[in-house]
Amino acid sequence: MTRPPGASFAEFFPTAPKVKAQAQTRADQVRDRDRFKTASTPATINGTIDSTTGTAVLEADANVSLNGIVSASDTMPTQPDDTESPFTDIPNTVDSASSYSSAASSIFSTSTRHGAAATTASSRLPTSSLTPSAFKESPNSAPAAAKPDMSTYQTSDRAARQSSRNSPATGPNVSISNGLPSNERIPARDPLPSVKGLRCTYDPLLDRVHNKSVSKSAKPTYEEFGREDDAPPPKDPRLARSDGRLGYINTDYYLPKSRLRTAPENIKPYPYDPKTSIGPGPPTQIVVTRYNPLIPFSKVTAIFASFGEIAESSNKMHPETGSYLGFATIRYRDSKRPDRPPVSGIDAARRAVRARGIKVDADIVRVEYDAEGRRSRRMLEEHLKREKEKFEKIEQERLALAAKAPPTGPKSGTAPAFTRPPPTAPKGPSAQRQSIPTGTPQIPLLGTQVQGLNLEPSNLAQKLADDPYIYVTGDSVPVLPSILPHMKKRLKSYGFEEIRVDKSGYFIVFRNSFTGSSEAERCFRAVNHTEFFNYDMTMQLCLPRPRREDGSGRRRSSASSDRHTHAEPRYRDEKDRRRREEEADLEEEKKQRAKNFDPVIEAVEVVRREMMEHLIRHIRTKVAAPALSDFLDPANHAAKRRKLNIEHPDDLQEIPSIEDGNDSSRVGTPNSRADPIERRTGRLEPKALPRIRKTKVKGQAQKSAFVDPFARKRPPVARNAFRSLHHRLRSLDSDAESDDDTDTRALLARETEEADSRPRSRMSTDDEASKDDFVPWEQGEDDSMTEASFAIADTASTRKRKLVASLESVFKRQKKSDEELFGVNLETLDSEFKGREDSVDIIPEPETGDDVESRVSRSETPASAIGKPLKKRPGKRKKTKKASFEEPEAAKTQPETEQQPGDEATEPSKVKQEKAEKTSMEELVPEKFDEKLFATEPLTPALELPEGAKPDLPIFQGLTVSAQDIPDLAKLARRFNTKDIGNAELWLWTRNRIRELNSARRTLDSPVTIGGYYVPNPTGCARTEGVKKILNSEKSKYLPHHIKVQKARQEREARNKLGRDAAAEAADAARIAAEKLVAKGNSRANRATNRRYVADLNDQKKTLGQDSDVFKFNQLKKRKKPVKFARSAIHNWGLYAMENIAKDDMIIEYVGEQVRQQISEIRENRYLKSGIGSSYLFRIDDNTVIDATKKGGIARFINHSCMPNCTAKIIKVEGSKRIVIYALRDIALNEELTYDYKFEREIGSTDRIPCLCGTAACKGFLN
């Protein structure tokens, strides 16, 4: 592009001294020139002007005559630029060998001078006098900034003088004044012929090259030029080459600036500089289009940030819907970063626009300049215009369809205003009823056509007489246009064909077949009288009438054709109406959202709702509950109970039994996983299902450990589902709050806890309770190594007698059936099975009262599988002979295991039991025998089994069999795969030695078993039991830490029986252990090493100051102890020491994610919802919590103990608080690490967490 001419210095500064001096000089020159013109002969130009053609013939000389046509179209003088030079190349075609000649050649040529004078006179002078206003671009009408050509004035003056001197006036003359304009520039040279310069005609230096005889004193000769009028123009030296003009044009590679250019060339613009440039400058903002509006805008900005630093970016959105439109504007700014080269915003925008093929995901975007945002604004307006046109087109189509529909009745003059409910209102009929039209109130007529709903004639029921349909009356569900789509969505699970509407209601039509009738009946049964928004959907089922032979097919075909004829247009109208309603809903929602977007109003609504909830809770807990409690107090209704002969509620108190598993008193620890109301009343239920309260009725049959398989099945007794309300209002603490209030109070109590050094975890949650509740275990199967697992209530002798009596009747039936089945007298076999080791325990061991009070509930693994009621068997199965023998022996040995040394009250019951068993056994002996069933010769026993023997190799060795009974080894080898064991005798000897070592009696006959380890399945088969955890009672037989805990528990139980206070002794032992310092003897080398280590520590103490905790933390790498985590006897996982740890040694740091208090509460709720039962949250202060649930170390596995061996300290290191675990006393190898969680004591709280540490000083609860 060409650079436009700039303003001159004189225009900007007209009062400058230099400008004034130049103006004065020009005025003097003009004055001198005028004086010269008046002194000479007046110049007249004789010419002939043709009136028809407007041609002026000028006669300037006898030899020079030029005729020209002067017209407005031909006379267009060019405006010279300020930068023009008089020596530039000027095209010329008069008397020149080249079409391009220099300015000097045109000035010094006579013919050129005459031609130029004639041409100028013919093209300038007549136009200035004849048509001065017809040329806007002429020098006279040009602005002051235009500068006329000096050569033009020079040639015109010379032509004027010659014409006035040589041409007399003849014929009709036209005198044209030759006055110069007032702003005419003074010529730089004298217009008259004068010496222009000197030309060297002889140069002796050049002549001496060819002629050596030239004298050295010879001087060059010069000749003046310029005075001749007819001097030929000088030749162009560039054309003096041998190859001429073509060689010059084509060989300019070594002179690129002298290239011949036949067309103007764009000059490179100057770079923009805000300091010297005027105007907005090049654009720095671009607009990006054609990308997917659904992708994140960060991807677009990330791609265009590679061109430069982005100052601002805007993803254009729809002003009404808020949806993105798919184009954005990005503005760049100058980037001056020390690590990168500087990039200006102009260059960044230019690079972004010039880049090709930029992809955003799978779309190639388009980038254009948008300096002031006009392009993006125009695109937004076009988009809105297209949407408006589209909406208007749809509206016109709707109106056209409405105009084509037949009128259904008179319409009122004023149409009701279509108002929409607020966005928060439901999109149902209730929301439509809230919109009250403004204007003249109208009475709704059922006969008129509802907007968007095509009503059919009133005889629709007659048309559908042969089809199954359901009729919904208009009284129950009003006929509104918004009801129909919601009704279709509600009934979409039923196979209806269509829903037709008339002024009386809705007709839900089904297919005329057996399937359609079935679907209609199913829909009627499921949906009739159900809630549909705020309406009661009342239905009437109308099945097709019985078919008649005459005309039934004709009626059915006519009804079907009528229905299908109207189905298609109704479907289209319904689809269009639904789409228009959705668009109207969207527009109204936008308006309401923009109108109601006020955070203050929303905050007021939130506060109002919370205050309403608190008020209702306060009324329910503080007003209603005490009033109901006082009203339902049994003492206030004593007279009425006596009148109606009703028992006192205290007489209905149930007695806990062993079989029920409820062996703890009301004073004991409540079950944390039981129902909240049952926890408050202190009553333990045998099962804890999630949020389902189990009720008991007086006289309910208790399940025993054994179920009589031969007893008659009694009909089930109808039980009341709920007890009367006074059962729950016995104690004042149970009527204070409901379940929801209990949960709310627990949350509030948790929020108001003070900051303490404890992890907010290890709590029993509802999720854990619900998980454990689905496991078929009873309360007696508590999996815990604490004293609670072995604590049993004191049992009465009367209860034992009842149990024995029930067992005797069972044994009688079993023995009788066995005798009939096997033909064996069981009396003769009683002696063989006395003193069996692996007999099944039936009654658990009794426990002391102290153990009952210290019992803690823990529902993980059952402690005993016999103490619970048996499951309902899937079917009766016959017992084996072995099982039949084991049960009576178990009944015999059980009273012996129950009997305690000091229990004298059970002696009479034992004697009675023995007598009853003896009499029962005698009664079972048959009086007469059938001699045919017995052999006549004495029998020789082939196999004599020792006591408690099982099939094994020693049994086969002592077996005396005949040759017929010996198995065929060759046949067995072909049938089964064999294995080579080498020497059979050596293998047998090795196996017998191993069996002797593993057996209890060191014999081959005794079984290799662990006493009490084998527990039979209650259902008789392991497959029917499902998956169970291993009981802690079984783990205590082989796991070291369980064995240690069990031994300590047994020692405490023994001390309690002797009357010693275990808690006091434990406190004394802890105090002695804390004060005791173990002196360890070391060798000489060890002592020297310790001295060096102590000296090193002292030096570091001096450097760090007196803060010993900080010093210990800095030595964590040197003093960290090796620990491991494994299954704990206290709870889930635990941390164990892998070496002996001395007192006050640092063990490990509690590492986790540091979060704020508010974030920790949100995370705790999230963990509970996601099923994470335990959350490892450790509070540092009021505002900081360490969360080690998902990011943390193994220190989170340290359990709580009331007699801990560690402590947690919070120390400050380099401005941040850290949690470090220290040893309180000497810790042995493989000892579990524990510390006190230090929960706040909540005496009287209904949501207390039981403690499971099992120590002598256990407080029972964590809180």
From Swiss-Prot:
<dbReference type="InterPro" id="IPR017111">
    <property type="entry name" value="Set1_fungi"/>
</dbReference>
<protein>
    <recommendedName>
        <fullName>Histone-lysine N-methyltransferase, H3 lysine-4 specific</fullName>
        <ecNumber>2.1.1.354</ecNumber>
    </recommendedName>
</protein>
<dbReference type="Pfam" id="PF00856">
    <property type="entry name" value="SET"/>
</dbReference>
<dbReference type="Pfam" id="PF11767">
    <property type="entry name" value="SET_assoc"/>
</dbReference>
<feature type="region of interest" description="Disordered">
    <location>
        <begin position="648"/>
        <end position="688"/>
    </location>
</feature>
<feature type="compositionally biased region" description="Polar residues">
    <location>
        <begin position="431"/>
        <end position="441"/>
    </location>
</feature>
<comment type="function">
    <text>Catalytic component of the COMPASS (Set1C) complex that specifically mono-, di- and trimethylates histone H3 to form H3K4me1/2/3. Binds RNAs which might negatively affect its histone methyltransferase activity. COMPASS recognizes ubiquitinated H2B on one face of the nucleosome which stimulates the methylation of H3 on the opposing face.</text>
</comment>
<dbReference type="InterPro" id="IPR003616">
    <property type="entry name" value="Post-SET_dom"/>
</dbReference>
<feature type="compositionally biased region" description="Basic residues">
    <location>
        <begin position="869"/>
        <end position="882"/>
    </location>
</feature>
<feature type="region of interest" description="Disordered">
    <location>
        <begin position="544"/>
        <end position="592"/>
    </location>
</feature>
<keyword id="KW-0158">Chromosome</keyword>
<keyword id="KW-0156">Chromatin regulator</keyword>
<feature type="domain" description="SET">
    <location>
        <begin position="1121"/>
        <end position="1238"/>
    </location>
</feature>
<feature type="region of interest" description="Disordered">
    <location>
        <begin position="749"/>
        <end position="783"/>
    </location>
</feature>
<keyword id="KW-0489">Methyltransferase</keyword>
<feature type="region of interest" description="Disordered">
    <location>
        <begin position="118"/>
        <end position="195"/>
    </location>
</feature>
<keyword id="KW-0949">S-adenosyl-L-methionine</keyword>
<dbReference type="GO" id="GO:0032259">
    <property type="term" value="P:methylation"/>
</dbReference>
<feature type="region of interest" description="Disordered">
    <location>
        <begin position="211"/>
        <end position="243"/>
    </location>
</feature>
<dbReference type="GO" id="GO:0048188">
    <property type="term" value="C:Set1C/COMPASS complex"/>
</dbReference>
<feature type="short sequence motif" description="RxxxRR motif">
    <location>
        <begin position="1087"/>
        <end position="1092"/>
    </location>
</feature>
<feature type="region of interest" description="Disordered">
    <location>
        <begin position="72"/>
        <end position="96"/>
    </location>
</feature>
<feature type="compositionally biased region" description="Basic and acidic residues">
    <location>
        <begin position="221"/>
        <end position="243"/>
    </location>
</feature>
<dbReference type="InterPro" id="IPR024636">
    <property type="entry name" value="SET_assoc"/>
</dbReference>
<dbReference type="InterPro" id="IPR024657">
    <property type="entry name" value="COMPASS_Set1_N-SET"/>
</dbReference>
<feature type="binding site">
    <location>
        <position position="1237"/>
    </location>
    <ligand>
        <name>S-adenosyl-L-methionine</name>
    </ligand>
</feature>
<feature type="region of interest" description="Disordered">
    <location>
        <begin position="833"/>
        <end position="922"/>
    </location>
</feature>
<keyword id="KW-0808">Transferase</keyword>
<comment type="similarity">
    <text>Belongs to the class V-like SAM-binding methyltransferase superfamily.</text>
</comment>
<dbReference type="Pfam" id="PF11764">
    <property type="entry name" value="N-SET"/>
</dbReference>
<dbReference type="InterPro" id="IPR044570">
    <property type="entry name" value="Set1-like"/>
</dbReference>
<feature type="compositionally biased region" description="Basic and acidic residues">
    <location>
        <begin position="561"/>
        <end position="582"/>
    </location>
</feature>
<feature type="compositionally biased region" description="Basic and acidic residues">
    <location>
        <begin position="907"/>
        <end position="922"/>
    </location>
</feature>
<feature type="compositionally biased region" description="Basic and acidic residues">
    <location>
        <begin position="675"/>
        <end position="688"/>
    </location>
</feature>
<feature type="compositionally biased region" description="Low complexity">
    <location>
        <begin position="118"/>
        <end position="134"/>
    </location>
</feature>
<dbReference type="GO" id="GO:0003723">
    <property type="term" value="F:RNA binding"/>
</dbReference>
<dbReference type="InterPro" id="IPR046341">
    <property type="entry name" value="SET_dom_sf"/>
</dbReference>
<feature type="region of interest" description="Disordered">
    <location>
        <begin position="404"/>
        <end position="443"/>
    </location>
</feature>
<feature type="compositionally biased region" description="Basic and acidic residues">
    <location>
        <begin position="749"/>
        <end position="765"/>
    </location>
</feature>
<feature type="compositionally biased region" description="Polar residues">
    <location>
        <begin position="151"/>
        <end position="181"/>
    </location>
</feature>
<dbReference type="GO" id="GO:0005694">
    <property type="term" value="C:chromosome"/>
</dbReference>
<dbReference type="GO" id="GO:0140999">
    <property type="term" value="F:histone H3K4 trimethyltransferase activity"/>
</dbReference>
